[in-house]
Amino acid sequence: MAKILVFDEAARRALERGVNAVANAVKVTLGPRGRNVVLEKKFGSPTITKDGVTVAKEVELEDHLENIGAQLLKEVASKTNDVAGDGTTTATVLAQAIVREGLKNVAAGANPLALKRGIEKAVEAAVEKIKALAIPVEDRKAIEEVATISANDPEVGKLIADAMEKVGKEGIITVEESKSLETELKFVEGYQFDKGYISPYFVTNPETMEAVLEDAFILIVEKKVSNVRELLPILEQVAQTGKPLLIIAEDVEGEALATLVVNKLRGTLSVAAVKAPGFGDRRKEMLKDIAAVTGGTVISEELGFKLENATLSMLGRAERVRITKDETTIVGGKGKKEDIEARINGIKKELETTDSEYAREKLQERLAKLAGGVAVIRVGAATETELKEKKHRFEDALNATRAAVEEGIVPGGGVTLLRAISAVEELIKKLEGDEATGAKIVRRALEEPARQIAENAGYEGSVIVQQILAETKNPRYGFNAATGEFVDMVEAGIVDPAKVTRSALQNAASIGALILTTEAVVAEKPEKKESTPASAGAGDMDF
């Protein structure tokens, strides 16, 4: 396959065009007056969204070189989303500004590596300032404000605050689609552990890459399963019931895994397999915890149970099992309350006698899993398009709220990034040459989110930014784009999680500096396909 090679300025400019294509589509969604973006779907109705990462994921450019730039910017959005769960649009806007200002300087003869060092030092200074401005999130009011801002919707904020109040800040909260028009909060007993599906072929929803099993049997095996003959008797028994099956084992491999995948793909049996959580003796105990929660029995040869002799009565049951690539949540386990309480009491006794800090931490984790429940937010809407958009906003808001609990909140609306400018300006005085220029690139980029929020609301961005910067006494002073007033952002409830703001800046600078130091791009050469006269009048078209 022939390749295209592009060097120096031409390579960087091609990447910049790709970056701009994604950023221009994404940045219109920023802020309370952010505009909608309509996404065409191959099947079904179009999606209308204000979520930056959703828009970014949809962009594929025809030009191979530009598409590489677009993919790099998508990486900024998805990385920020993975770390903090929100802030994707802010990260995109920052990255675009760093690339734009940086390439101007590289074209004028600046040393890209010195610029990169300057950018990194400036980001470090800005991050310290963000941490200094952070306010810890203690009460319900602060949690509600963060969720409301993230979703642009007070109803979302209230429900997430209710959910966190019920299950605690460390509790498990899941967002599901409701069959009705109403959005409701339900509290369900549940058990979650950090192991995902062994094979992606077990996925039932390719869009979210999740496997969901409703009213499932749960087979809990202590050993590694590789021999399919051991597994077949119980598989046949479950297949006759027509119910799905979750297998939790040390590992499932070889012909046993192949058999499960083939049965799943053929539709003979809805099945998923996950590795057991923990290691050694702790794994044995956690499997017993899961057995207590689901009302099953651990199939262990130590206890005299063999897998080939397993019966349906030994299997656990659960209303719903949700498995992602990283974790498994068992909701509505059919275990007896007294069995679960016996496990909890046993762990409490162990806690009293243990001296090891590590063992204590792990025991408390097990206790939380057994004692805690799952808060389920069931999202309802009139149409499928609205439902998907609303569910997405709930997920975003939930992630933002968790990030806020972790690292605190800062004034929103791009104000915190503007306040970080003073730290960067102090740093610029200590730097010289192209390193100082690199820091100035970050200084200019820090204005961009506030400017964009104002412009999306129909105001002149640069005027708003200057007015905020002119107020030096109150670091929380900023512009409420929803009402068009200048206010104390924290008092007005316009706050962002510090983690989101920090991650957005760090990821944007990382990709921005990468593009500035690019000297060559290698891309696939597009194939010229022969035109085929598929239908009358179509002979001149490329297919």
UniProtKB/Swiss-Prot annotation:
CDD domains xref list: GroEL
GO BP term (any one): protein refolding
A Gene Ontology cellular-component term: cytoplasm
Compartments (UniProt record): Cytoplasm
Entry EC no(s): 5.6.1.7
List of residues binding ATP: 29-32, 50, 86-90, 413, 480-482, 496
Keyword check for ATP-binding: yes
Chief location: cytoplasm
InterPro entries according to UniProt: Chaperonin_Cpn60_CS, Cpn60/GroEL, Cpn60/GroEL/TCP-1, GroEL-like_apical_dom_sf, GROEL-like_equatorial_sf, TCP-1-like_intermed_sf
Catalytic activity: ATP + H2O + a folded polypeptide = ADP + phosphate + an unfolded polypeptide
Keywords: ATP-binding, Chaperone, Cytoplasm, Isomerase, Nucleotide-binding
Pfam families xrefs: Cpn60_TCP1
Entry-linked HAMAP family: CH60
Quaternary context: Forms a cylinder of 14 subunits composed of two heptameric rings stacked back-to-back. Interacts with the co-chaperonin GroES.
Stated name of the protein: Chaperonin GroEL
Organism: Thermus thermophilus (strain ATCC BAA-163 / DSM 7039 / HB27)
Biological classification of the source: Bacteria, Thermotogati, Deinococcota, Deinococci, Thermales
